[in-house]
Amino acid sequence: MGMRCIVLEANRIGWGASGRNGGIAVPRYKLTYPELEKRYGREVAELMYRAAHEAVGVLEGIVQHYSLDCGFVRSGHLTPMVSANDAERFSADVKWLESVFGDRAPRVLDRATTARKTGTSFYACAYHEPRGAAIHPLEYCATLAHALHARAVQIHCDTPVTAWHASHSGVVLDTPRGRVHCKQLVIATNGYSDLTPAGRLLSKRVVPVASAVIATEPLPPQVRKEMLPDGEPATDAKRLTNYYRVLRDGSFFFGGRGGASSSASQRIYDRLRRDMVAIFPQLQSVPTRHQWFGMVAVTLDTLPHIGSLDQRVHYGMGYNGRGVALSALFGKQLANQVAGNAPSLGPMSGGWFQAIPFHAFRVPAKHVAISWKQMADSFGL
């Protein structure tokens, strides 16, 4: 017997990061697998490897099960890099995967192959993961919502939860449009947890960081042939990451961290375009068509977290820019958790997800962190 579910959306479907992201699904975390082993041990690193690959598989399974027209493709994924330190990190990752799992799929590409696959000579090498995927995130949200609505799942947009409290029979949620009584509550507010007072208990456990995006006009045919010719999206290895892909209409999508504030000024977009042209000089004369930004939820340990505040209130959040696939996995695991089966995802579900110290000073702290990361990227640290 299934569960009767109601979705309360503060704005409209896909308004937040779920619709604004880069649509890149890759079976990786911010840390490499040897780094995860060093921090948590071999057994946990192996568990997290399996979870990361399961996450992309769950996303693909949802698309196939509901026949969603959202551009999902197992495109592969590139992590280009310029620093020798990053090359060492990812070379160690390749060796670890082969040694521990016999996984020979990922490899580090040389400069010439990287230049051919990316369309630029900017990088020294790249980590190639052939099992990565790409998707149109807003189309995914919209078509999934339509499929669920057709299966009698109630979705109420423009219905922010302003408060919630436990009752003798479950949880009571207050909204401007009425009150909802439920047996179990799942909070999935991520980088927008401070949007209403109801999410502020969890908002202190993540730091929202703006990520800005520009999209060009469709590329001229000759330029289009050069840019990521094998259709693989890319996320570079810098601390202040850039991510990019060629979209289905032939336009070029380029994103990067948008600064410490919760908004993106024109200065941010101008800097993003300068970064894009520095990497891809052939885009100098291609106009920008669209620009937007959204919030990424960052955690202290760079990992997302799934857990419960009590037996009736659950959460999944803090994806650190890896939420396209991992949020699909967390959705599956949250359903199991609501049904009474706690997930086993190592440090992502181990119960440690505390408030960030001095959270009230997060904006000046972000300025300091961004400046340090910019310096580290400049020196290839």
Give residue spans per PLM region.
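Active-site substrate-recognition segment that forms the wall
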Residues: 57, 65-74, 161-163, 168-169, ...
